[in-house]
Amino acid sequence: MGLTLALVSAVAFGGSGVAAKPLIEAGLDPLHVVWLRVAGAALVMLPLAVRHRALLRRRPALLAGFGLFAVAGVQACYFAAISRIPVGVALLVEYLAPALVLGWVRFVQRRPVTRAAAVGVVLAVGGLACVVEVWAGLGFDALGLALALGAACCQVGYFVLSDQDSDSEESPDPLGVIAYGLLIGAAVLTVVARPWSMDWSVLTGTAAMDGTPVAAFLLLGWIVLVATVAAYVTGVVSVRRLSPQVAGVVACLEAVIATVLAWVLLGEHLSAPQIVGGVVVLAGALIAQSSAPAKTPEEPVAGGGPERELSTPGTTA
């Protein structure tokens, strides 16, 4: 049951960018799509926030960091990135997050890391060089790559904050953290995205998925209900039922699923070297994630993929 839920979560998370990109290409600003996703999911998760309202008093810094970095920061950077580069490439760049976390642990906190973790970092960086085709002078939009890297850095920012908070005597309920993170993220994004300036008429029309028209409201419904609410809930439940190693492997499947969906539904094809590089990135991320020190937050990070790897109990990356 746990493995089934983990696979459902990976598929749901993997489809977020594939559903969001047609809306962006139809005329919505990436920030507006992020706001719709986060605000809609926050509304659905509001009952959980009420149920866990004691978290506001017990862990305000953690909730603020989750909302600012893991929700608003990661999603804004990721959706802005996929408006400029392929979905699969953006997500694979995000998979540098576990490697960046280990870099922070080793060089800033000056805590030891294992040799296997160092190998994972080298693999992740080397694989990324293949994904972005450095030999061709970075064939992708530089700003798009920078935004994807920004999403990875936001995950590291949340790790740093939650790692400092992890000495607390009691771990908060992850669903409560998600609910408040979405509410805080929605509040921040409302100020930044200014949704009152959105072209709402786009949502009443259609968006093209590789030339096939799809109702915009269906894509939005997928992003909010499936790729956010259902993905988080199934992800949290599955992590509680699986070992950290299995959960980490399944989390890596999100990038594979997103790349395949983008290939089939959006026509975003990757070259053979990019596919090989993507496999190497995922292998490096998995090794880095599974070889990290034992001290870690147990709260999930918004967005899936490497964010979800950072949430696996018993790991720091």
Regions from the PLM with identified roles:
Residues 12-17, 46-94, 130, 224-242:
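Specific transmembrane alpha-helical segments of multi-pass solute transporters/efflux pumps
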Residues 19-22, 40-59, 123-139, 183-216, ...:
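Membrane-interface helix-cap regions at the ends of transmembrane helices
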Residues 20, 25-73, 98-104, 154-161, ...:
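Transmembrane alpha-helices of multi-pass small-molecule transport proteins
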Residues 32-43, 79-118, 151-152, 245-263:
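Specific alpha-helical transmembrane segments that line the substrate/conduction pathway
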Residues 34, 38, 133, 218, ...:
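C-terminal-most transmembrane helix of multi-pass membrane proteins
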Residues 45, 103-104, 113-134, 152, ...:
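Hydrophobic transmembrane alpha-helices of multi-pass small-molecule transport proteins
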Residues 45, 101-102, 137-204, 300-317:
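Transmembrane alpha-helical segments that form core, pore/gating elements
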Residues 75, 90-96, 161-186, 224-264:
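Helix-helix packing/entry segments at the starts of transmembrane helices
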